[in-house]
Amino acid sequence: MFWTFKEWFWLERFWLPPTIKWSDLEDHDGLVFVKPSHLYVTIPYAFLLLIIRRVFEKFVASPLAKSFGIKETVRKVTPNTVLENFFKHSTRQPLQTDIYGLAKKCNLTERQVERWFRSRRNQERPSRLKKFQEACWRFAFYLMITVAGIAFLYDKPWLYDLWEVWNGYPKQPLLPSQYWYYILEMSFYWSLLFRLGFDVKRKDFLAHIIHHLAAISLMSFSWCANYIRSGTLVMIVHDVADIWLESAKMFSYAGWTQTCNTLFFIFSTIFFISRLIVFPFWILYCTLILPMYHLEPFFSYIFLNLQLMILQVLHLYWGYYILKMLNRCIFMKSIQDVRSDDEDYEEEEEEEEEEATKGKEMDCLKNGLRAERHLIPNGQHGH
């Protein structure tokens, strides 16, 4: 049964244009062509990237965070068995009636009970150091892969002439630069997917799962169907904006408001140009319209463009939130990351303001400076 399914799955009519056989894509005369088996290495490479990430966060990101004045903070609350049991077994957000009853039971004021629950919720928030480490790692990878992508593509004719994307398709040999560009990019997305449950959780958690799965599916499919040339263009268009986002987040956690805001505006500009202009009017035009001058519609052509359109929907989704943030900054002078961590940013800010009134000296508020001055207090995580 397995072999029957395998034979059906790899039928040429699903993957290749009519009249083309898998035998046409076998290596010959020193030319190497893509093979699905090439992608097996992306899983072990993903775990290797996780090891490299761990080393990077410890020996590069942590010292860098320290130089910015970001330290590991241990949030402690006064032990209280009654409140702790209610927090764990009932709710983390007690109603006013609950607060009144707990205050009576613990011989505390209602304000003290509210402060205890707020502090207890904040105790489980990821620290600024952890957020900085994650952003620093993503920044380093996106910078490396973008520079590598530009180096791989700058002398390729299909970067400047989209007709070259389909010249000779699908009998286009695989270049070593294309191999490593794909393998590294796919391995990175696998590593992000493996770490989603352990990294800082955000409200757009489901969107990230969809994005990573769509990215891996798209790269895997484009590899197997030998859409390598268009695939490299898709990857470079996506990576070029993320560098600025992750760097903005790093400076956000460091409390460098002016630098963070400047980088975020740069990111927003590049995002809208690359993903809402270049992607739909250049990439989708290349994959949706140009093939029809050479080929009749076939299954992989339809499936490829379906996946690209899913990505475009995600672009519009993230673009909407970016516009909301920019609108708040420009017109309301108050900005909060509407896609930030699951915990309430206002809670932590309020707690810190209370500490400040007690005379505790702070360099800046956790997760960046005050909301009315900072573009991304908890860090924006878009793709």
Curated annotation (Swiss-Prot):
Expressed in the epidermis, where it localizes at the interface between the stratum granulosum and the stratum corneum (at protein level). The chain crosses the membrane at residues 32-52, 139-159, 174-194, 205-225, 264-284, 298-318. It catalyses: a very long-chain fatty acyl-CoA + a sphingoid base = an N-(very-long-chain fatty acyl)-sphingoid base + CoA + H(+); docosanoyl-CoA + sphinganine = N-docosanoylsphinganine + CoA + H(+); tetracosanoyl-CoA + sphinganine = N-tetracosanoylsphinganine + CoA + H(+); hexacosanoyl-CoA + sphinganine = N-hexacosanoylsphinganine + CoA + H(+). Changing S340A: Decreased phosphorylation. Residues 342-355 have a biased composition (Acidic residues). Residues 342-363 are annotated as: Disordered. InterPro entries: HD (IPR001356), Homeodomain-like_sf (IPR009057), Lag1/Lac1-like (IPR016439), TLC-dom (IPR006634). It comes from the Eukaryota. GO terms for molecular function: DNA binding; sphingosine N-acyltransferase activity. Its EC number is 2.3.1.24, 2.3.1.298, 2.3.1.297. It is an enzyme of class 2 (transferase). SUPFAM superfamilies: Homeodomain-like. PANTHER family: CERAMIDE SYNTHASE 3, LONGEVITY ASSURANCE FACTOR 1 LAG1. It is linked to Ichthyosis, congenital, autosomal recessive 9: A form of autosomal recessive congenital ichthyosis, a disorder of keratinization with abnormal differentiation and desquamation of the epidermis, resulting in abnormal skin scaling over the whole body. The main skin phenotypes are lamellar ichthyosis (LI) and non-bullous congenital ichthyosiform erythroderma (NCIE), although phenotypic overlap within the same patient or among patients from the same family can occur. This is Ceramide synthase 3. It comes from Homo sapiens. The lineage of its organism: Eukaryota, Metazoa, Chordata, Craniata, Vertebrata.
